[in-house]
Amino acid sequence: MKVIFLQDVKGKGKKGEVKNVADGYAHNFLIKKGLAVEATSANISALEGQKKKEKKEAAEELKSAKELKKQLEEITVELSAKSGEGGRLFGSVTSKQIADALQKGHQLKVDKRKIELNDAIRSLGYTNVPVKLHPEVQATLKVHVKEQS
C-alpha cells in the first residue's frame, strides 16, 4: 500500500515521502497513529501544493533576509558604556544590547541569537559583528561603543 508520511518514521520514511509499505503496517500503525495517510490522487496533489507553498515561503524569507542585510550593512549601532583606563569597559556589550539598540534606534528587529558575537565586546571603539540572518545570508553590522558621560 502506498502512503504519504506526515512525520518522520525511523527506518521507514521522512515527512512528505511517498512509499510503499505493508497493508497491515499502514492501516494498523501508520494511519491509526496519524503518522501517514493513504496515497490517493487527492492526497498527492495536496502534498504537491504544500511543497510549492513551502518553496515560495522559503524564497520570500531569503528575499527579506537579503533586504535586511542591505539595511544592516548601511548603519552603525551606537552604544555607550562606562569604561576605565585604556578604553576597557566595566562589564561588556552583549548581543542582547545590540539587538535592543537596533530595535530602538533603527526600528529593525533582529533576534539576539542571530547576532554571532563570539566574545562580548569589552572595549571602546568600532567592532564589526557578523549577523546570520538566513542559512545563505550573513551580514556584517558595525557597532560603535563610546564612553558614557
UniProtKB/Swiss-Prot annotation:
Keyword Transcription regulation appears in the UniProt entry: no
Name of the protein in question: Large ribosomal subunit protein bL9
HAMAP family xrefs: Ribosomal_bL9 (MF_00503)
UniProt xrefs under SUPFAM superfamilies: L9 N-domain-like, Ribosomal protein L9 C-domain
GO biological process: translation
Protein keywords: Ribonucleoprotein, Ribosomal protein, RNA-binding, rRNA-binding
GO molecular function: rRNA binding; structural constituent of ribosome
PROSITE patterns for the chain: RIBOSOMAL_L9
Role played: Binds to the 23S rRNA.
Pfam assignment, any one: Ribosomal_L9_N
Family: Belongs to the bacterial ribosomal protein bL9 family.
Cellular component GO terms, alphabetical: ribonucleoprotein complex; ribosome
InterPro entries recorded: Ribosomal_bL9 (IPR000244), Ribosomal_bL9/RNase_H1_N (IPR009027), Ribosomal_bL9_bac/chp (IPR020594), Ribosomal_bL9_C (IPR020069), Ribosomal_bL9_C_sf (IPR036791), Ribosomal_bL9_N (IPR020070), Ribosomal_bL9_N_sf (IPR036935)
Disulfide pairings: none
Encoding gene (name): rplI
Keyword 4Fe-4S: no
Entries under NCBIfam families matching the protein: L9
Source superkingdom: Bacteria
